[in-house]
């Protein structure tokens, strides 16, 4: 059974905790995880790239010069895609909110649980106890990570009320600070170590113990 390393931020004590439930006992399936990552990244795209087509470019629609007798190649108007400053043929246009890759809820949950289970099996899951910052302190945040022995990149999941801790850790370049619902499969795979505060860990496991 996978275990998480528990570190007490107040006393510096270390312990281990068994990880139970579907969050940590799901077999990772690479094809499902791949689909989830692609869907997540597609959902973050804004799809706002826009180019002007021939009809949207300013300019006359008149033929530039006569068809015959000039010795030059025949040409149409100045808005032709072949000319500098002309319209773009087949260029990108803004797309609607339903555009992009989709994944159903069951697959998304299986991918998330599989990625989390893989981190737990590798021993790269940590729970941080007694994370109480009276005021933001990046120095103390860096010292805590050093005492824990974690190396970046680190994904730190905090509860929404742990504001001082979030302000302390977010200045560290190797740490990505997110809320309980602010990360997905992509962030789990990108991080070397995943650290949960005790409150964030409680939110993660709530309602999933029975599957």
Curated annotation (Swiss-Prot):
<feature type="compositionally biased region" description="Basic and acidic residues">
    <location>
        <begin position="10"/>
        <end position="28"/>
    </location>
</feature>
<comment type="function">
    <text>One of the primary rRNA binding proteins, this protein initially binds near the 5'-end of the 23S rRNA. It is important during the early stages of 50S assembly. It makes multiple contacts with different domains of the 23S rRNA in the assembled 50S subunit and ribosome.</text>
</comment>
<dbReference type="GO" id="GO:0006412">
    <property type="term" value="P:translation"/>
</dbReference>
<dbReference type="InterPro" id="IPR013005">
    <property type="entry name" value="Ribosomal_uL4-like"/>
</dbReference>
<dbReference type="GO" id="GO:1990904">
    <property type="term" value="C:ribonucleoprotein complex"/>
</dbReference>
<dbReference type="Pfam" id="PF00573">
    <property type="entry name" value="Ribosomal_L4"/>
</dbReference>
<comment type="subunit">
    <text>Part of the 50S ribosomal subunit.</text>
</comment>
<dbReference type="GO" id="GO:0003735">
    <property type="term" value="F:structural constituent of ribosome"/>
</dbReference>
<keyword id="KW-0689">Ribosomal protein</keyword>
<dbReference type="InterPro" id="IPR023574">
    <property type="entry name" value="Ribosomal_uL4_dom_sf"/>
</dbReference>
<protein>
    <recommendedName>
        <fullName>Large ribosomal subunit protein uL4</fullName>
    </recommendedName>
</protein>
<feature type="region of interest" description="Disordered">
    <location>
        <begin position="48"/>
        <end position="99"/>
    </location>
</feature>
<dbReference type="InterPro" id="IPR002136">
    <property type="entry name" value="Ribosomal_uL4"/>
</dbReference>
<dbReference type="GO" id="GO:0019843">
    <property type="term" value="F:rRNA binding"/>
</dbReference>
<comment type="similarity">
    <text>Belongs to the universal ribosomal protein uL4 family.</text>
</comment>
<keyword id="KW-0699">rRNA-binding</keyword>
<dbReference type="GO" id="GO:0005840">
    <property type="term" value="C:ribosome"/>
</dbReference>
<keyword id="KW-0687">Ribonucleoprotein</keyword>
<feature type="region of interest" description="Disordered">
    <location>
        <begin position="1"/>
        <end position="28"/>
    </location>
</feature>
<keyword id="KW-0694">RNA-binding</keyword>
<comment type="function">
    <text>Forms part of the polypeptide exit tunnel.</text>
</comment>
């Amino acid at each position: 059974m996978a275990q998480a390393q528990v570190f007490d931020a107040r006393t510096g004590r270390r312990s281990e905790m068994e990880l139970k439930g579907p969050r940590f006992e799901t077999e990772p399936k690479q094809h499902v995880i791949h689909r989830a990552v692609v869907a997540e990244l597609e959902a973050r795209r804004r799809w706002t790239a826009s180019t002007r087509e021939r009809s949207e470019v300013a300019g006359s629609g008149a033929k530039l010069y006569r068809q015959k007798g000039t010795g030059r190649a025949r040409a149409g108007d100045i808005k032709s895609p072949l000319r500098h400053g002309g319209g773009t043929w087949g260029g990108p246009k803004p797309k609607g909110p339903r555009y992009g890759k989709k994944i159903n809820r069951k697959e998304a949950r299986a991918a998330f649980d599989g990625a989390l289970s893989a981190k737990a099996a590798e021993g790269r899951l940590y729970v941080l106890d007694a994370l109480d910052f009276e005021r933001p302190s990046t120095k103390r945040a860096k010292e805590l990570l050093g005492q824990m022995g974690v190396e970046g990149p680190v994904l730190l999941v905090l509860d929404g009320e742990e504001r001082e801790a979030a302000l302390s850790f977010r200045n560290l370049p190797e740490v990505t600070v997110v809320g309980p619902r602010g990360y997905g499969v992509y962030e789990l795979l990108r991080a070397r170590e995943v650290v949960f505060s005790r409150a964030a860990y409680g939110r993660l496991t709530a309602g999933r113990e029975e599957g």
